Amino acid sequence: MAVVGLDHLVVNTRDVEGSISFYRDVLDMEILRLDEFREGKVGFVSARVSQEIIIDIRPTKFEDAVTPNMDHFCLVLGPTAMDNLYEELKAKGIHMDGDVHPAWGAQGMGQQFKIWDPEGIKIELRCYSWSP
């Protein structure tokens, strides 16, 4: 197979600071190139998912954005992250869809719940090694 992995996803946003805050403060992701972005040297920032994968956070006037055609993406959580994350996000008032429930994915069955980022993109948060 020629495809061996995923490099990045791009999230268009009208509120860059709100999206940076969401991915950094809510999902505890490292934000890359923030100083360069704020200095106008680069056109977007990125949130580190793993050593191999990033989410680019691109400022876009909504009328300039391509028609949205993404339903969701799924982030895999570490084995202990699920213990408190659901309740922490709920307490912060993050828009959620339902409770933690079993779901099938690339690594088989796991437990997941869904949240939305500030631009309305659905994010599944899944753990394969956690059991309630």
Model-derived features: where do they sit?
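Vicinal oxygen chelate
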Residues: 2, 5-14, 35, 44-48, 64-132
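A short, local hydrophobic-aromatic micro-motif
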Residues: 4-7, 32, 55, 71, ...
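Conserved beta-strand in the GNAT
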Residues: 55-58, 124
